């Protein structure tokens, strides 16, 4: 009986040792798994942070780029509005010249524009008080001295003209209205106007 008890004891001892070895091994493996998982978690966290920073940087760059484009667009719109206003003011100044200065300007313009001095002149209703028959007499006298016909006369034709005039012959029409002349010269003048307005 003692022999059996001894065998049982040995079996229990062996089982206990085996159990302890298994537990130790399991603990060690668990610790290794946990350490590996912790390292992976740290790595993943670092990668996620790196990605998040990259995404954030990209998003920031995108937002700033859009904001810069919008700012530039607004600046160009404001710049264009100021240039437009400068041309509108220039036209208004021409339209609102004192009658004598206005007549003098139109006088010089007709002399420069007349081809043979045998044209009709179309003017706005508002300008009929400034561009008078007396003015055309002066113009015709000056044209005759230049060797031209000296026969500029009022046309019965009506056009929507704000200021200036149109000279018309049987074959040609010369537009000397202020808005047209400003429009024609705008491309050339716009750069200069912009330089004056926005000189840096």
From Swiss-Prot:
One of its GO terms (biological process) is proton motive force-driven plasma membrane ATP synthesis. Gene3D superfamilies: ATP synthase, E subunit, C-terminal, F1F0 ATP synthase subunit B, membrane domain. The keyword NAD does not apply. One of its GO terms (cellular component) is proton-transporting two-sector ATPase complex, catalytic domain. GO terms for molecular function: ATP binding; proton-transporting ATP synthase activity, rotational mechanism; proton-transporting ATPase activity, rotational mechanism. InterPro entries: ATPase_E_C, ATPase_V1_Esu. Keywords: ATP synthesis, Hydrogen ion transport, Ion transport, Transport. Pfam families: vATP-synt_E. Belongs to the V-ATPase E subunit family. Produces ATP from ADP in the presence of a proton gradient across the membrane. This is V-type proton ATPase subunit E. The gene is atpE.
